[in-house]
Amino acid sequence: VNENAQQRRSLPLRIIHRLYVLVRGYFAVVGLLVTLGPVLIVALATRGGGEAPKTKVDFSVEQPARLKLGLHGLLVEKEPGISDRFLSQLFGDDRSLYLPDIRSALRRAAADERVARLEIEIGSLTGSLAELTELRRMLVEFRESGKPLHAVLVEGSDWNYYVASAAGHVILNPASSLIIPGPTFTLTYFGEALRKLGVEIEVLRAGKYKSAFEAFVQNAPSEATLEQYRTMEESLRAHLVEAVAASRGKDAATVRGWFKRSIFTAEQARASGLVDAIGYDAEASDLPATAAREPLVKLEDYAASGAPETRPVVEDQGGIALIEAVGEIHMGDAGMADEGITPLGLRRELRWAQTDDKVKAVVLRISSPGGSAVASDMIWNDVRKLAAEKPVVVSMGAYAASGGYYISVPAQRLIAEPTTITGSIGVIGMLPRLGAFEEKYGVSFHIVTQSERANLLNPGGKGSDEDRALMTSTIDQVYSTFLEKVALGRKMPVSEVDARAQGRVYSGLQALDLKLVDAIGGLPDAFKAAKELAGFDVDKLYPVLHYEGDEFALHECLGSPQQMMRCLRRGGARVALPPLAVGLAWGQASTSRAEAIAKTLERWVDAGALAVWPGYLSAEIDRPMSSTSR
């Protein structure tokens, strides 16, 4: 609820409102426990006994610690929904690595005198190129603090090696090998296979490089497709070579030769200079004698121990809003925001940032390959309205292509990772034709309509030239609109945009050369730019503000478990859980709602009762209250 609206309410109305939210929250809690109670019992039984996890860490300036970061699993840049995180932790299957958590912990560790060094172990690490680039940048920044950084490669793929090479010492598992071909695109084509099944695809497009449906029509990539993939591959390879060469202290020609050869045994990798040692942990490298006496602390335990922030947060000047748009763009209701990007779902966040006086600038994090043209245009309009009133900086993740780029262009500044896939300024449509399918399998299609486009609408028919002309005109109109809006946002003539467009995809580095983005960098760089545009001191920390969600009607809290979770997150939990926490804490009261919940949950954990809850609830409830180093 908008803070100004709260102030305008009379006292009785405010009391009634708080009682309503309280009751609604309890409905959500009760409904959630009833629905998930049996699941919780089974899950806890299957997890087995044992001690609750400990987050206490014992080290000091006199006896500094070695931090260990295990990089096994999926890198995720957006924190998962409350229900997803709860269920994954409940069943012990939460292998996701959250980049914001890693960034915060490494930043603090770099300035913490109690931390002597960092060891990372890289196994089955997966993620987009942009996420891996962001992770590597964090490690480079930690190394630049002057503290030793050791990396142990359990599995040696090219992008795992890319991350590991940020370390000053790289150790390779003796049973492993390095397989590093570098950027590789595998293009699979189904044209002939579909024709054998009696299926033909008619593609209508604006932009000769717009090749999304080419695989369903042809048996091999077109020259235009090969051209854009070759240039993008070379751009990504050049970045990979430059980054590894700088960290390993080698010339670019040597590193490029490594990737061309592609395959090394552990001993060959050591002899060629790709790694420094062969072994199972950091002790295989030249550690000082004092390292053996240093306590070994997991990075997640260090983060949970409440490591001190080195700089104060400026709380009285407002803050910067972070809005995340991740996934495909499609039409849908606001409740489908967890399943991609919808105009209604994102509009709530954009309008909140536009009207909330505490928000002085906005970082819009976009990671989207595109989607619906209509949905993209609706979001573009909302971003435009926001940018007309407050500075907006777009931070591009893995993708900001097609519709993902469309919704980016109203922002005052666009920042991409070198490995971001962007551009794809074009429009494409597909019409399946099943006439041969009808002849082959005896399946017929009949359509009853007064429309003159009957053959076009019938999957078993063939559209006329007039049909195709009409469809092409709609495609061309959308493309023309796309060009005009890019030209408006990037402040360049439409003809120049058209020359860069044509549906062609680019790496972030290519996009910078073409002036489709303003700078190369990650999310921290976007926050720095936002601070500049907001008139903040870039060397100080300011609160990062998050949209807390709209309130739910009472009956909405009684829906599916997922809906109950959303109800808890969007207001119900903030009111209902504190009194519940106080009650469960055997009457212990607290003036701080977050503190009350934390103390109660700590007792549960110490009793070994519910070890999955601290990370689940504290991350979600504390999130709107917390400030980070942006």
How would you label these PLM feature ranges?
Residues 376-382, 389, 484-489, 496-503:
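Generic long, charged, amphipathic alpha-helical segments
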Residues 413, 432-446, 450, 459-460:
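Conserved phosphate-handling catalytic cores of large alpha/beta enzymes
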